[in-house]
């Protein structure tokens, strides 16, 4: 299909529209599309049965440019319709989009509009869902044409005994009353609904209705207005024609042992066709009304199971007592067609792994596992190997990569330098849910992430996963570097507040590094020539993280406060304070300064610098 489109819209389809989907006129003038047989493939020839669920005449040939009987083969016969089997010579890909249809012997309701919340049919007709189900599933009759003389009001429900009393009465006036049951009765009632008049009547009643009834009237008015605005006919919620999905979307595959694995939809379609054909035969031979009603109810239940298995109650199960997957099960949920295949497609140059903390990283860096990096950047590595003349073809380049030699890792490091990558954590609720980083090769299989960027992703390190994407074009790379780099996104787009803020372990760590430990104030006689000596002493366990020490820092501008006192000893001027000491020769301008601190505060200062 070469048609381009901007959006996908789901709405009601008319019976004529459903027929258009499945009905086609072949080049020889023959009209095909209706499925009349429940069979799938012939057990001897293993070819699709004609007019069955895999019919080649309706859906197209199984093999490219080859008819069912084998008379015509090859593309040179394109467009010809075989005289023997009636199959059009065409590409087999049409079996992915060509649909069929089933002409139902009796109308059935669409289970979504009966059992859905809210029930559209029940709201339009102004009845409860329970009353609607009584009619649809042949438990109660409904008056579709009132007779005031007999006290039969419009939409009045009648039991089996009431209907028999009227049916066996010979009075002509009683026969004038149309009393019906099943989906056909609902269709008649929907035909009689004047949407514009119903909407105006509800608007007149609303000011005088009590709260409970006003809410019910508002819900009904909302549904009626939706039908008026969309110009859909409410009777389209009653099915007379059932569309059949293309066969390649419900395949049947032969296994090694000769058995076949088939889609659950084929079993559900088979139930519908069997019951529909049986109902048609019973109507032809004018079977008793009780039998026909029972068959109509079974057809209704079969269509319900096909559309949404288990919606009404007990689900239809297969051979292993597993509920069969219906059309609704295929399209809904996380594994459904929309979220799995249309909205969340797998893309090339992407990967996924668990994230762990990487406090040693810079804010604009992330740790990319080597195993993932060599796979994602493989095309770039192959191009660089060929460009530099190290190999002559792609096969030789792949051989070098598979050997995990030092040359491959050296080229990979060169390729990754300056090439940003995108990290995304689902769900991406705002634009900071996907940001770019400069990749750093790390061992293991986990992605390492700087802890400060976690609030933007709403991520933590309890097993969260993130996706990696490689921007390919120069435009994408420049956009990733200029706009999406993590240090450039330090403000929340929602509130404008800083989002790169330390929390949890980082706050606790800063507090622990700078905390005062009174027990460490007893020994104040540790002096160090610079900060490096102090850190070296801490690493050698000579002092504790919270030990108070004096460190010489002549290059730091120390402001002496009022608490500092000066004394002179010989030609030395000594300055004493709570956290500051200095000494200066009276004959020289150089001053030796000391500051009281702890190894923890020195470490924090180095981190900030």
From Swiss-Prot:
**Which residues does the record give as Mg(2+) binding sites?**
460, 462, 464
Q: Which cysteines are joined by disulfide bonds?
A: none
State whether keyword Nucleotidyltransferase applies. Answer: yes
Q: Where in the cell does this protein reside?
A: Plastid, Chloroplast
Which SUPFAM superfamilies does UniProt cross-reference here? Answer: beta and beta-prime subunits of DNA dependent RNA-polymerase
Q: Give the residues the record marks as binding Zn(2+).
A: 67, 69, 82, 85
Q: How is the cofactor bound?
A: Binds 1 Mg(2+) ion per subunit.
Q: Which gene encodes it?
A: rpoC1
| Cofactor(s) required for function per UniProt | Mg(2+); Zn(2+)
Question: For this protein, what is the EC number?
Answer: 2.7.7.6
Q: What is its main location?
A: plastid
Q: What is this protein called?
A: DNA-directed RNA polymerase subunit beta'
The enzyme class is transferase
Name the GO cellular-component terms: chloroplast; DNA-directed RNA polymerase complex; mitochondrion
Q: Give the species.
A: Emiliania huxleyi (Coccolithophore)
Q: Which UniProt keywords apply?
A: Chloroplast, DNA-directed RNA polymerase, Magnesium, Metal-binding, Nucleotidyltransferase, Plastid, Transcription, Transferase, Zinc
Catalyses: RNA(n) + a ribonucleoside 5'-triphosphate = RNA(n+1) + diphosphate
The family database entries (InterPro entries) matched by this protein are listed as: DNA-dir_RpoC1_gamma (IPR012755), DNA-dir_RpoC_beta_prime (IPR045867), RNA_pol_asu (IPR000722), RNA_pol_N (IPR006592), RNA_pol_Rpb1_1 (IPR007080), RNA_pol_Rpb1_3 (IPR007066), RNA_pol_Rpb1_3_sf (IPR042102), RNA_pol_Rpb1_clamp_domain (IPR044893)
The record's subunit annotation is: In plastids the minimal PEP RNA polymerase catalytic core is composed of four subunits: alpha, beta, beta', and beta''. When a (nuclear-encoded) sigma factor is associated with the core the holoenzyme is formed, which can initiate transcription.
Q: Which family does it belong to?
A: Belongs to the RNA polymerase beta' chain family. RpoC1 subfamily.
Q: What does this protein do?
A: DNA-dependent RNA polymerase catalyzes the transcription of DNA into RNA using the four ribonucleoside triphosphates as substrates.
Report the GO molecular function annotations.
DNA binding; DNA-directed RNA polymerase activity; magnesium ion binding; zinc ion binding
């Amino acid at each position: 299909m070469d048609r381009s489109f901007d959006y996908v819209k789901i709405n009601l389809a008319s019976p004529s529209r459903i027929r258009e989907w499945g009905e086609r006129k072949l080049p020889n003038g023959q009209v095909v599309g209706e499925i009349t047989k429940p069979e799938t493939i012939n057990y001897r020839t293993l070819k699709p049965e004609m007019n069955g669920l895999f019919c080649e005449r309706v859906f197209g040939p199984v093999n490219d440019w080859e008819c069912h009987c084998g008379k015509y083969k090859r593309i040179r016969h394109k467009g010809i319709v075989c005289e023997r089997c009636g199959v059009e010579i065409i590409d087999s890909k049409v079996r992915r989009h060509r649909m069929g249809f089933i002409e139902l012997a009796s109308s059935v309701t669409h289970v979504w509009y009966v059992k859905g919340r809210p029930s559209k049919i029940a709201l339009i007709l102004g009845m409860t869902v329970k009353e609607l189900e009584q009619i649809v599933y042949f438990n109660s009759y409904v008056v579709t044409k009132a007779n005031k003389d007999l006290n039969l009001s419009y939409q009045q429900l009648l039991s089996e005994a009431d209907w028999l009393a009227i049916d066996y009465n010979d009075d002509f006036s009683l026969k004038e009353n149309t009393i019906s049951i099943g989906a056909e009765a609902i269709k008649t009632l929907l035909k009689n609904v004047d949407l514009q008049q119903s909407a105006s009547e509800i608007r007149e009643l609303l000011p005088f209705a009590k709260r409970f009834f006003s809410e019910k009237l508002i819900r009904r008015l909302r549904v009626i207005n939706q039908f008026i605005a969309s110009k859909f006919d409410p009777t389209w919620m009653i099915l007379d024609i059932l569309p059949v999905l293309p066969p390649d979307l419900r395949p049947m595959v032969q296994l090694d042992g000769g058995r076949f694995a088939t889609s659950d939809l084929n079993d559900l379609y088979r139930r519908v066709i069997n019951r529909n054909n049986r109902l048609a035969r019973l109507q032809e031979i004018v079977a008793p009304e009780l039998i026909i009603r029972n068959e109509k109810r079974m057809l209704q239940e079969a269509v319900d199971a096909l559309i949404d298995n288990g919606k009404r109650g007990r689900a239809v199960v297969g051979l292993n007592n597993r509920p069969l997957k219906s059309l609704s099960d295929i399209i809904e949920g996380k594994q459904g067609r929309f979220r799995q295949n249309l909205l969340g497609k797998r893309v090339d140059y992407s990967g996924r792994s668990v994230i762990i903390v990487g406090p040693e990283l810079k804010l604009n860096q992330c740790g990319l596992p080597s195993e993932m990096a060599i796979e994602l950047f493989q095309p770039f590595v192959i191009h660089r190997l060929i460009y530099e003349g190290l190999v002559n073809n792609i096969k030789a380049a792949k051989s070098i990569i598979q050997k995990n030699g030092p040359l491959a890792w050296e080229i990979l490091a060169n390729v990754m330098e300056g090439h940003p990558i995108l990290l995304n954590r689902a769900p991406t609720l705002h634009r900071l849910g996907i940001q770019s980083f400069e990749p750093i090769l790390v061992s293991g299989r986990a992605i390492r992430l700087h802890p400060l960027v976690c609030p933007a992703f709403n991520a933590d390190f309890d097993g969260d996963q993130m996706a990696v994407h490689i921007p390919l074009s120069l435009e994408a790379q420049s956009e990733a570097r200029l706009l999406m780099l993590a240090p450039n996104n330090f403000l929340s787009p929602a509130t404008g507040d800083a989002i790169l803020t330390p929390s949890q372990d980082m706050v606790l760590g800063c507090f622990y590094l700078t905390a005062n430990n009174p027990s460490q104030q007893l020994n104040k006689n540790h002096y160090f020539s610079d900060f490096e000596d102090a850190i070296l002493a801490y690493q050698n366990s000579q002092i504790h993280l919270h030990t108070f020490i004096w460190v010489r820092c002549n290059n730091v501008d120390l402001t002496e406060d009022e608490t500092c006192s000066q004394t002179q000893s010989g030609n030395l001027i000594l300055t004493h304070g709570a956290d500051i000491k200095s000494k200066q020769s009276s004959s020289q301008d150089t001053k030796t300064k000391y500051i009281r601190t702890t190894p923890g505060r020195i470490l924090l200062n180095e981190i900030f610098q």
